[in-house]
């Protein structure tokens, strides 16, 4: 994957009044004491992923950012100033007024989106003026996700609702996943018709089918993040861990 982020500037977002990150590398890890703003940096960058909420359930901003109302997005509640995240790939800005509510623009190198978010924090309007997807993708592991079929070759942010399709579409990924279960004398079964994943366990002459969501969270988490990495190229991937 080519490095496509070198410098990021964040302003007026949650606890961040103004912050510049420079000389970013291919892999960047934010480490620090609790409540110093590490997650807010990830959340600010995740605003680039708003267009992917169209393919997600629910289509709410809370899938990317922790908040209960619009004003929590703005530094010290100051909605007179716009939230702005600028980087090598473009600018994302969010604004608020009583008439329009929360709205914004995502101005990328080859794409432009107009964003409208209602008072329930649901993405209501998303106008794409070109035909490319954003290069920044936030992935947030959740259990009990209902999988669905998708033509997307990449894992759909933020929850990976097309996990089954992605594993099937990438032979090396599928091989890795099957090996993970083989180590525990288990087999993975893909039901394409119902878009479900089952785990097959053999005990003597008996066969048991175990729901995917019943296996250990650690194993589900590993498969989720492997799928995100295998299915993306030329993208910036954001992980909570």
Which residues does each predicted region cover?
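Pre-Walker A-like glycine/lysine-rich segment at the N-terminus of P-loop NTPase domains
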Residues: 1-48
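Phosphate-coordinating catalytic segments in nucleotide- and nucleic-acid-processing enzymes
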Residues: 2, 51-240
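Walker B catalytic carboxylates
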Residues: 11, 240-241
């Amino acid at each position: 994957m080519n490095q496509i982020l070198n410098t990021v500037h964040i302003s007026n977002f949650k606890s961040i009044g103004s912050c510049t990150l420079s000389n970013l590398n291919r892999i960047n890890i934010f480490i620090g004491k609790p409540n110093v703003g590490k997650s807010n940096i990830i959340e600010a960058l995740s605003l680039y992923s708003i267009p992917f909420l169209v393919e997600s359930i629910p289509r709410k901003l809370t899938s990317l950012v922790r908040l209960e109302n619009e004003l929590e997005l703005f530094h010290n509640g100051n909605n007179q100033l716009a939230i702005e995240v600028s980087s090598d790939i473009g600018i994302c800005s969010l604004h608020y007024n009583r008439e329009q509510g929360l709205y914004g623009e995502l101005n990328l190198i080859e794409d432009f989106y107009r964003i409208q978010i209602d008072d329930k924090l649901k993405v209501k309007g998303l106008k794409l003026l070109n035909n490319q997807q954003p290069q920044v993708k936030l992935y947030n592991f959740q259990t009990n996700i209902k999988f669905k079929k998708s033509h997307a070759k990449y894992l759909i942010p933020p929850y990976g609702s097309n996990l089954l399709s992605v594993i099937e579409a990438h032979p090396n990924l599928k091989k890795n996943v099957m090996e993970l279960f083989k180590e525990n004398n288990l087999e993975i079964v893909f039901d394409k018709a119902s878009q479900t994943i089952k785990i097959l366990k053999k005990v003597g002459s008996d066969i048991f089918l175990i729901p995917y969501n019943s296996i250990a969270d650690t194993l589900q988490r590993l498969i989720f993040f492997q799928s995100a990495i295998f299915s993306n190229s030329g993208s910036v991937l954001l992980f909570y861990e």
